[in-house]
């Protein structure tokens, strides 16, 4: 354990609760810090804050009073979703107070190796794939991070034999200083969260923080399909191991429908348990990590063949009267929907698309829409999606919401067809998040059975 003395008897302000905030608060308290928790949710509506107070941790709820920072705090640990232009964060930085996320705590309380996975798309699937392959290869792995299990909590339970497999967002990485994974994976890079970061360059810089403490004994796994990611290869002290579906590289690659690692045959691409070209990329990244950590070819092949996917990420839901349903609600941008469509015969696909209108047109998606059986469109962005469908010469049906869209798609589907929810848009015009949107799709499927 690297950090006990770093926080012991130090005053720490924890800004924002949620699941990871509670975990961080309890860990800091356990390590002897003098913790103050500040959360915007009113105390009477905040059972987490109530529980922390009962356990002797100071809690201030209902607002974020700037005068709180007049106290002499040695450290701020913030929820990753809280922006750096938040007045509390700005004041802390102005006073020279270090600002961390709980990922930094997770690193500092555990001595086990970390595999960190970041990128714009594919993080959760790749993180899950890696953990499953490592466990199948008798290399015990624990999932944590942005995937829903607080890293600071999981890190405390890790034993010497374990590897932490950690999904990392740009928001989390911005709050790190000494964080040092043994292997870092960059799945891909496209413009995302620009409202948070300001520019694409700043977004990439936040992602690239994953490797800043790495050395030549560590490994960065990079998607060489992408120019933006490939350009990072010369900007690290770590050893770069690439993967690609487009060229033979000194790492993992696709050639003639087969997956290889440095010339060693691993498996056929069509043996991967989930469809789509993006899942071939995810599998290649997984193969690199597995081989670096000593997993044999048979364990990799068997695990990737059995991989069933992740909820809301091109998840096979089931069949009704020979019609297959796939839930790709996590598809919140054009690239994700392009990747989803790549795994299917368009002539059999009824695509459900549309959602929050962010002002972007969908011209990039037009070539991928050509030949679709039909589209069901909805949400604020429906007029823009309609324009793309018109250019692709695909007929559309309008829907009120996801439940309505699912029913309308099924009504026109025939045996052998595919109903694919892959919205290419965020959910916030109708639903709290992509999980809620996907759950409505799943619930409607159950009602149609």
From Swiss-Prot:
Its main location: cytoplasm. GO terms for molecular function: ATP binding; UDP-N-acetylmuramoylalanine-D-glutamate ligase activity. Pathway: Cell wall biogenesis; peptidoglycan biosynthesis. ATP binds at residues 119-125. InterPro entries: Mur-like_cat_sf (IPR036565), Mur_ligase_C (IPR004101), Mur_ligase_C_dom_sf (IPR036615), Mur_ligase_cen (IPR013221), MurD (IPR005762). It is an enzyme of class 6 (ligase). NCBIfam families: murD. This is UDP-N-acetylmuramoylalanine--D-glutamate ligase. The lineage of its organism: Bacteria, Bacillati, Bacillota, Bacilli, Lactobacillales. The gene is murD.
